[in-house]
């Protein structure tokens, strides 16, 4: 959707960033802070692509999901916003999950990750 985007920033500077955005926001643009609506879980490491493929039922190849991109995926029929990035120097994804589904997705990561010693 070209009329929609997300800004992800550190929890430590959430209020600072929010204030800065609102200060310069065009009056025709709606700002909605959804921080409390989502949990973020990270899946990182050399086996992360295999685990993500198992959980989402798709192959997460470089050409299909390049570094620095994001897309909505389904895990257990739950829409999860996945971002391919890494702050740890390994292949990986951040998963933004509706807070009410965070526990079930976490349990899925742990269960399916056993196969990969995660």
Language-model features: where?
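Basic, glycine/lysine-rich polyanion-binding surfaces/domains
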Residues: 1-118
């Amino acid at each position: 959707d070209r009329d929609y985007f997300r800004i992800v920033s550190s929890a430590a500077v959430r209020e600072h960033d929010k204030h800065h955005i609102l200060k310069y926001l065009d009056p025709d643009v709606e700002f909605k802070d959804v921080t409390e609506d989502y949990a973020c879980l990270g899946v990182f490491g050399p086996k992360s692509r295999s685990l993500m493929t198992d959980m989402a039922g798709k192959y997460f190849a470089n050409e299909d999901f390049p570094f620095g991109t994001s897309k909505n995926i389904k895990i257990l029929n739950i829409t999860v916003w996945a971002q391919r990035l890494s702050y740890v120097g390994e292949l990986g994804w951040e998963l933004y999950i509706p807070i009410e589904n965070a526990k079930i997705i976490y349990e899925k990561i742990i269960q399916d990750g056993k196969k990969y010693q995660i």
